[in-house]
Regions:
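Conserved short "hinge" loops at termini or chain/domain junctions
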Residues: 1-68, 105-117
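Short loop/turn elements at secondary-structure junctions
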Residues: 61-117
């Protein structure tokens, strides 16, 4: 079974934002939904899917797909971080972008493999 943790709360935690601090929730939700749309285009997750608050979980998006869970969580975290709070260092930004490209490749590869199989 995929993770039943709230998508919003896990991304906030990874961004270093306390779960009870809601000042940026609407901005973060918008960026999460943008990223989920990218994942939809890759063939990952349930389609169409978006979050409206803290109720939606990773299991809601991925179902029982444990294989993609950590890849997707890391991808969403990094993508939201790059939009919401980009690093000041160009070296860190480049490292994040390279990681995002690698994650995109891996996620698309898994989705293509499952389609063929």
């Amino acid at each position: 079974m995929a993770d039943s943790e709230s998508i919003l709360q896990s991304i906030k935690k990874n961004l270093g934002i306390m779960s009870d601090y809601g000042q940026f929730d609407q901005d973060i939700i918008m960026h999460i939904n943008t990223t989920l749309n990218f994942l939809d285009q890759f063939g990952a997750g349930k389609q169409p899917f978006h979050i409206t608050g803290a109720e939606e979980t990773w299991a809601d998006f991925l179902g029982d797909d444990e294989e993609k869970l950590n890849l997707v969580k890391t991808y969403v975290t990094l993508k939201v971080r790059m939009i919401f709070d980009p690093p000041a260092s160009s070296a860190v930004s480049q490292a994040y972008n390279e990681t995002l490209k690698e994650l995109e490749f891996r996620i698309i590869s898994i989705c293509d493999y499952k389609e063929e199989g």
